[in-house]
Amino acid sequence: IWLHQYVGLKATDTGLIFSAISLIALCAQPLYGFIQDKLGLRKNLLLVIAVLLILSGPFFLSFAAILRWNIFIGSILGGLYVGMTFNAGIGVLESYTERVSRIRGFEYGRARMWGSLGWASATFIAGHNINIDPNYNFFMASIAGVIFLILLALLKTDKPDAFNQLEHGKPSALTINDALNLLSLPRFWALILFVVGTCIYSVYDQQFPVFFSSQFASLQQGNEMYGYLNSLQVFLEAGGMFVAPFLVNKIGAKNGLLLASSVMAARIIGSGLVEGPIMISCMKLLHAVELPILLISIFKYNSQHFDKRLSSTLYLVGFQCVSSIVATLLSPLAGYGYDHYGFAPTYMVMGCMVVGTTLLSAVLLRADSKALPQHDMTDLDSNNKAQPI
């Protein structure tokens, strides 16, 4: 909304910016993942991200002027900052939380639920602020970064030796070859194919606020209503994060992935078929069903079928990084489609792509019954290196 209504960019230009953000995130995510796997439970990388979050206010206050001056330079700078801070940084935080949940013995979804509640509160307030002064949101972002840094400094973690015993080998013993060995595993590429389809939801979400706001008599009313809708969605998502672990444990990680992908396809295709703000809102709210199941299932699937020491690398490369690649390629095409054909036909094409990858994934993803035995996750020889299976 801010890029379109306040900076004055067209959908194609907005797609260029999102493409740059995704490209930078693509480069940062594998690096972040491997670094965090090496760090284990140490918070060094999270502290760096916290400092970048604090700088979000000053950055965005000058970002609009840079974009109006030169869209290409602005896209590069925006890609560097947003890609490294938010798009790549959120994956580090989520994988860190999931790693702690495995060690401490609680469900990841119950911790992630609080992130959804925070997002819901932020979007509710931002929906009001953007009609008053969008800069208020940027100041709030920096304040939130300060709070995150304080909480991170107060967070107590396990001793490294306890972590090493639980993870069947020291994270510091990981090498680049351990991470690269993933590329030789057919099951890794099957996971990549699934993610290629499901990450289309991020491209769908990028300019959905513009589409939704256009359904109302005035853009101001549309902005405010979108803030309410987004807040409701994320509050429902938080509830879904609490319930999703029970469902995924019942149906299995693979079936959970396929269910989330099916809901996603229905949501995107439905957005292209229905008319009016009420029905479009219903399609948007399906995200609250889809995302909790997807996140819980992807972490459970990774822990069942891959070396657990590489959990951050798997999530940031196998999920976040692939999402960035697809977003880099599809964001400009989606922007072109919105400008020349409209939102509805473009959504139909996106939804059909998700249907195709879902059907292929139903065949290629490994069943829970083929999960690796605990002792096969790593080779506990003197070198303590993970072996491809």
Can you say where each PLM-predicted feature lies in the sequence?
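Symmetry-related core transmembrane helices of the 12-TM Major Facilitator Superfamily/SLC fold
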Residues: 137-154, 345-364
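Juxtamembrane intracellular "pre-TM" segments in multi-pass secondary transporters
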Residues: 156-192, 217-218, 381-388
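Pair of pore-lining "gating" transmembrane helices in MFS-fold secondary transporters
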Residues: 1-6, 80-81, 183-204, 285-289, ...
